[in-house]
Amino acid sequence: MKHFQFLVLIFLLFQFNFEVALGNPDSSDSDSNDDSKPVNVAYQNAYYEVKSGNFQVAIKYLKQAAKSSTNKADIYNLMGYSHRKLDLLEEAFFYYHKALKLDPRHKGANEYIGELYLRTNNLKKAEEHLEVLDDVCLFGCDEYDDLKDAIEKYKNSM
């Protein structure tokens, strides 16, 4: 019976939809079945703008979202991502560090700061964030795979 329960648990874990690296606005800080929790419209707008490649607009929405949201790690991760895509690397580092200070195990922030470290030729720091993801992603995750692939490409280009 214990083996059956274990198999059911494993099955359920694989069926569970883990958050995407950017932090899906529909699952970030509100329960979809709980209408009493406010939806952060600014964060949802920012997420849409990031997906559309409108990073300057996304940053404006993210600044609004940061004023009222309790899920600041996701917001700062998107801020870092948006700044990185605009080649504002110092600002990107600043926001990724803020996200990781709030949530050191944030998958998206660890992946993206690792990629940013590769962009600034700091392989050692990128590998440190890969180790964090290895610990966080017990059954593997896209963030780990993406950073691992980026590190391999970086090493092959040397």
Residue ranges and their predicted role:
Residues 37-68, 72:
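Alpha-helical segment of the N-proximal tetratricopeptide repeat
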Residues 38, 72, 106, 140-141:
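Residue-level recognition of tetratricopeptide repeat
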Residues 68, 102, 135-139:
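Structural marker of alpha-solenoid helical repeat scaffolds
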Residues 78, 112, 146-150:
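Canonical tetratricopeptide repeat
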